[in-house]
Swiss-Prot record:
This is RNA pyrophosphohydrolase. Residues 6-149 form the Nudix hydrolase domain. Residues 162-182 are annotated as: Disordered. A motif (Nudix box) lies at residues 38-59. SUPFAM superfamilies: Nudix. GO terms for molecular function: pyrophosphatase activity. Accelerates the degradation of transcripts by removing pyrophosphate from the 5'-end of triphosphorylated RNA, leading to a more labile monophosphorylated state that can stimulate subsequent ribonuclease cleavage. It comes from Dechloromonas aromatica (strain RCB). It is an enzyme of class 3 (hydrolase). Keywords: Hydrolase.
Amino acid sequence: MLDREGYRPNVGIILCNGRNEVFWGKRIREHSWQFPQGGIKRGETPEEAMFRELYEEVGLLPEHVRILGRTKGWLRYEVPTHWIKREWRGSYKGQKQIWFLLRLVGRDSDVNLRATNKPEFDAWRWNDYWVPLDAVIEFKRLVYEQALNELVRFLDFDRKGPRHKKEQEPFSDVVDSVRSEE
């Protein structure tokens, strides 16, 4: 389902733990990391889509999280032509997203990357709030920056400058879903 401009309606999810670190998922069989996200189905509200995607990609249920906030409007990014399937070229431009900021009220062990038979991620970790800006694929970077900047006001920590970050290795402490099931 595309809008008139060629954007697919979508939700993005920034999931925080009690230390305001964000969930960061490694796409299955790839070396790219991202926030959970997914399309809004016809007849679905953004919130319904968010809870469905949260379960499909992270294995969390509504009782495992609390909604802290959401973006006021749609944030858009264009997908480079070489990433677009041939049959969609000419009509598909990219994604338009409503972003949700969630707090995990459950435990880390509630995360289940294999909750469905089509997992999106094969590993995950908690990252400092701003680290994804340096690690996400280039064409999503501006939307990530817009979402993180708009939603940071719902979190309780001081922010020094537009991209305050602790010194942290972006991919230390990765949780491999295979290892975590043992």
